[in-house]
Amino acid sequence: MRALVPMVVAATALASPAPALKPRLDDGLARTPQMGWNTYNQYNCFPNESIVHENAQALVDTGLADLGYRYVTIDCGWGVEDRLPNGTITWNPELFPQGFPAMGQYLHDLGLLFGVYGDSGILLCGSPPNITGSLYYEDIDARTFAEWGADSLKYDNCYSDAATNYPNVNYAPSTSPHPRFANMSRYIQAQDRDILFQVCEWGIDFPALWAPEIGHSWRIGNDIIPHWRSIFRTLNQAVPQTDFAGPGQWPDLDMLLVGLDGVLTVPEEQTHFSLWSILKSPLTIGAAIPGMRAESLEILSNADVIAFNQDALGVSAALRRRWSDEGYEVWSGPLEGGRTIAAVINWRDEDREITLDLPDIGLQYAETLQNVWADETVNGVKTSYSSVVEAHGVMLVQLAETVEEGVYPADVFAATNRDVTTFSDVYAITSSPNFVLNITLTEVTAAATNITIITDSSRRPISTSIPAGSSSISTSVSLIAGSNNTITIRNAPPLSSITLSPPEPTYYTGAQDFTLTSPAGAYTCPDAYCLPAGSKIVDLSTESAATAHINSSTSGSKYLEIDYINNEVAFDSSWGWGANSRNLTIKVNDNNPVRLEVPLSGRHSELFGPGLGWWDSGRLGVLTDGWIKGTNELVLSNEGGEGGFTKYAPDVVGIAVYD
């Protein structure tokens, strides 16, 4: 075991080395995520001219176009099997009697943009009936799309693997799809027209590492399906990709389900739209706009949520904490102007009050908090904010004029009565006597000053002295995990603030500090992988466990940060219950285990990358109960995995214990 530098945010990602991304082409496109409408979710591979005209006009009539939804894309089903004698691709004249150039002009006359759809294989997705793809015809097709007046190209991945005789789908091709997409990108960029290029190869070969060089967005995973469960699956796949987002390069979580009849409830639609927005996914409506229910149209038209997506800073929100047993999780990220956006998802099937502890998103105080869907604005939020969140709903909050985590200005958090100053709403991530308290005075002391410090959990007051000529002093204090601690300071000169730092954690390496039961084993990774330890526990399951004996200075609840590895990507299983997650249980002594369903962590290709993505660490934190002073037994396993979760737990690199 060894000491580990404390983490500032409650949960972060550990990234194994990845090749540096080259700058996106400076073509001025997609400086913020693209927005629009696509035929597929509502009409599948059966679009026609009147469908596109009606929905395009509805974009304008409803005001959606003015809000930014401008790319109108005709997805699969628009073409024919044979090319023209000159080799050019063409549209189905029965479905689009006026033709695609006329369609482009129609959309442009409405102030919209024309999105076309192609495929990097020999046929388009949705065949049969067979519709020709662009493989081996990239040059002529790129020129044709430009001549039609296209403003964007969604480029798909069906019928593309030559080595296996061009099957409809191959999630494990023998070669990367990268060269095929790069080839079309090169020809698109050669046109005398700006065309936004959307890479749609379903997350195969971890496109976040190569797609930003050739396209403006890339699909992070398989198609979204018309079920609530697909939201969890998609978010789990997004976790290791959020930091790849930026102007001109956006992870695409796939089209929106909002507005599709009978698919999602209103709270579910709010959750879906909120998370796609703050993760900086392109926002592409997939439902029919004419006749859409008012609640769905209102969600898609929410100017605040759209603004979060289109924020000029261009930084995605990231997963901060996940409470699997309690059924909720927190995502957050920065916005322009020093603001913060946060989303708390209620995965349970019931309405309930949920509390957001601001330190979980790196904050201690917000002068203003806007609860978007509750239509509520609160001033002076200290440490925590609670609100009722509907079943499968989301608490989406924007925080402004904030103070960073661990900093407690006296004029906000303290009350003074004569020579006694008490700070309330003090947050502790863990129960420990080893928090570092720094007290800052309003001015330098003229003489040495003796003060007394009392906390809720300390058995005796702490007496210390502020030296003459000093304006601050530090000492260790004891706090209890939670957001309701108080710190009382007696006999102190006027105070400016206090600052609290968590205890320095002790790190326990999975492969070295744990005793393993078969079939679990230890695996040593190459240099600079399986961070921070360079090794990991593998094959933890419902039938095996890893046990460590850990000394604790106090009893109570302890915060742990778990460095895990999971790259079990849900490709075929995405159509069913595949969730891109693995289940881990953490048991302290004889207490009930805490369950943590971890997302993907892989940041390299699952087909060709180092370790196939199984050397890339992620990190999530959990609060565990039942610790005693002295020696504790900590057991990692997958208890209950046979009851609907995956059999195997994630690989475990190690655990940091905050004591």
From Swiss-Prot:
Catalytic activity: Hydrolysis of terminal, non-reducing alpha-D-galactose residues in alpha-D-galactosides, including galactose oligosaccharides, galactomannans and galactolipids
GO cellular component labels: extracellular region
Compartments, record wording: Secreted
Glycosylation positions in this chain: N48, N86, N130, N183, N438, N450, N484, N551, N583
Signal peptide limits: 1-20
Thermal dependence: Optimum temperature is 52 degrees Celsius.
Active site (UniProt): D156 (nucleophile), D223 (proton donor)
Pfam families: Melibiase_2 (PF16499), Melibiase_C (PF17801)
pH dependence remark: Optimum pH is 5.0.
Family, as annotated: Belongs to the glycosyl hydrolase 27 family.
PANTHER family registered for this protein in UniProt: ALPHA-GALACTOSIDASE MEL1, ALPHA-GALACTOSIDASE/ALPHA-N-ACETYLGALACTOSAMINIDASE
Name by which UniProt lists this protein: Alpha-galactosidase D
Naturally occurring in which organism (per UniProt): Emericella nidulans (strain FGSC A4 / ATCC 38163 / CBS 112.46 / NRRL 194 / M139) (Aspergillus nidulans)
Gene: aglD
